[in-house]
């Protein structure tokens, strides 16, 4: 069984009564809004003296979808420079990835630290 209803929408049928001009109640957009790309955030891994290199490579492969070669390069940068950028993402994705890495590291009993920083 289908129910149909007819709705008639009318606006100011009698013309302007208490308004001085005919455009009262009408919204007019002057210009198209400008769209901007969302701010990007770096996901950064920090070196520590206890997390095994194999574990860092695994994290980079699993959470950042890096191949073995690139994951190894990033891991070596973390090891030699103290930190390295794992990827550049919008804020919500960067926060999620950092939280996932930190949770996985804690569950695996490693002190690996992952944080986000605003790009630029």
UniProtKB/Swiss-Prot annotation:
Superkingdom to which the source organism belongs: Bacteria
GO biological process terms held by the UniProt record: protein catabolic process; proteolysis
Gene3D superfamilies found in the cross-reference section: 3.30.1390.10
Coiled coil: none
Job of this protein: Involved in the modulation of the specificity of the ClpAP-mediated ATP-dependent protein degradation.
Subunit structure: Binds to the N-terminal domain of the chaperone ClpA.
Stated family: Belongs to the ClpS family.
Name this protein carries in UniProt: ATP-dependent Clp protease adapter protein ClpS
Organism field: Pseudomonas syringae pv. tomato (strain ATCC BAA-871 / DC3000)
